[in-house]
């Protein structure tokens, strides 16, 4: 299928009353906006067409659903008060923007040299990142917001899958709720994993929907985790970092892992 035929199919699926769709021929993107809020999303067509040609139809449908749910959520008034149980931390790369596209400052705190902690209000199928404006409107302090979000993330389930490679154990958490990486902020979870580890505990948060713990007992384990983190990072919808973290007493230290060698901090 050629790009223009694909574009028309996508436009048809995203047709809604109150929305506008503009095509950027130079960038091969669609800009979908809500007429009332003037907010919207930009959809890159070439990567989407590539997925369709690989018969990854579910991925194409998910991208369209994300756009639709996102625009619908933008039209809703969001408040922190009354949503105390729906506030969660989200992990982002240190290079993630600190402002929204309409210039509002996002609330965040430093996490590691590679990562930041932002805060979000869960809206069911999506969430919205909390801005300074929203925080000030609530009358809350940042410390109270952070404590509430951290408390809530501890209440989330922790569905791990375990695998073993060359004497090293790997634990994969993937709940697909948007907060998989956020669970690294649950200190009780990190402590349990440290106590459980026979060798060196290493963690990876390659993208927002993945959290990996590894109990490393030999050089092969470091190499496998390094490759794994890089692969997950490249496949994530919202990448965080390809660098794993040495875990010591609950603290995370980013490390470079060279093939067949132990990491140097």
From Swiss-Prot:
NCBIfam families: PRK13668.1. It comes from the Bacteria. It holds the Pfam family DUF1444. InterPro entries: DUF1444. Belongs to the UPF0354 family. This is UPF0354 protein ABC2771. HAMAP family: UPF0354.
């Amino acid at each position: 299928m050629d790009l223009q035929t694909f574009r028309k199919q996508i436009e048809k699926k995203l047709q809604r009353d109150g929305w506008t769709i503009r095509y950027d021929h130079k960038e091969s993107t669609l800009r979908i906006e809500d007429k009332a809020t003037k907010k919207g999303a930009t959809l890159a067509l070439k990567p989407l067409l590539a997925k369709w040609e690989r018969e990854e139809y579910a991925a194409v449908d998910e991208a369209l659903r994300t756009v639709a749910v996102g625009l619908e959520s933008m039209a809703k008034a969001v408040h922190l008060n009354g949503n105390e149980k729906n506030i969660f931390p989200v992990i982002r790369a240190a290079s993630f923007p600190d402002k929204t596209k309409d210039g509002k400052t996002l609330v965040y705190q430093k996490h590691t040299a590679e990562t930041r902690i932002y805060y979000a209000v869960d809206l069911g199928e999506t969430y919205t990142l909390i801005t300074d404006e929203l925080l000030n409107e609530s009358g809350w302090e940042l410390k109270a917001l952070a404590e509430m979000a951290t408390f809530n993330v501890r209440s989330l389930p922790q569905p791990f899958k375990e695998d073993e490679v060359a004497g090293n154990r790997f634990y994969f958490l993937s709940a697909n709720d948007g907060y998989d990486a956020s669970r690294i902020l649950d200190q009780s979870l990190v402590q349990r994993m440290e106590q459980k580890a026979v060798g060196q505990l290493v963690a990876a948060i390659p993208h927002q929907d993945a959290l990996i713990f590894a109990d490393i007992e030999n050089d092969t384990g470091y190499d496998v985790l390094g490759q794994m983190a890089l692969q997950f990072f490249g496949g994530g919808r919202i990448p965080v970092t390809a660098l794993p973290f040495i875990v010591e007493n609950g603290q995370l230290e980013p490390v470079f892992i060279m093939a067949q060698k132990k990491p140097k901090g």
